[in-house]
A protein has these predicted regions:
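N-terminal presequence-like segments and the immediate start of the first folded domain
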Residues: 1-66, 70-83, 89-136
Length: 136
């Protein structure tokens, strides 16, 4: 049986600007993925379901990312394996706080990323939700 190794190429093509080089790439190509992991929306909740960082976008962002890390580790992966993120927030004006929190976790292996402002999330105290795909 052939042992396939995933090859992940991350890039930004010439001619397209990437004003946030610290948090995303324009494309990621995954050749021969061994496994794909699809994460459901991760919220700023602790293991008991309590909201973490109520009213604090940066703290809620950090908790969402820590929850993604927990899910990925349970599935055999890590944050470095994330190739795509969709972020839903109730307040896009707090974009700088979101970026600051993300930069603490995503340093070298940046995913593709989309951020969308929404009216509400599952609970009025939630400010942000992350959905992700990872490739091993």
């Amino acid at each position: 049986m052939e042992n396939r190794m995933s090859k992940i190429i991350r890039g930004d093509p010439p001619g397209l600007t990437n004003v946030r080089k610290s948090i995303y790439h324009h494309y990621i190509r995954v050749d021969n993925p061994k496994s794909l992991i699809f994460l459901s929306g991760q919220l700023s909740r602790d293991a008991f379901g309590n909201i973490v960082g109520k009213g604090d976008m940066k703290e809620q962002t950090k908790q969402c990312i820590q929850n993604m890390q927990t899910v990925l580790e349970a599935a055999g992966g890590s944050l470095d394996d994330i190739v795509s993120i969709v972020v839903y927030t109730t307040d896009i004006r707090q974009f700088k706080e979101i970026v600051a929190a993300r930069e603490e976790f995503f340093i070298n292996k940046l995913p593709t990323s989309t951020i969308v402002e929404v009216n509400h999330l599952a609970d009025p105290g939630l400010l942000i939700e992350f959905q992700a795909t990872a490739a091993l």
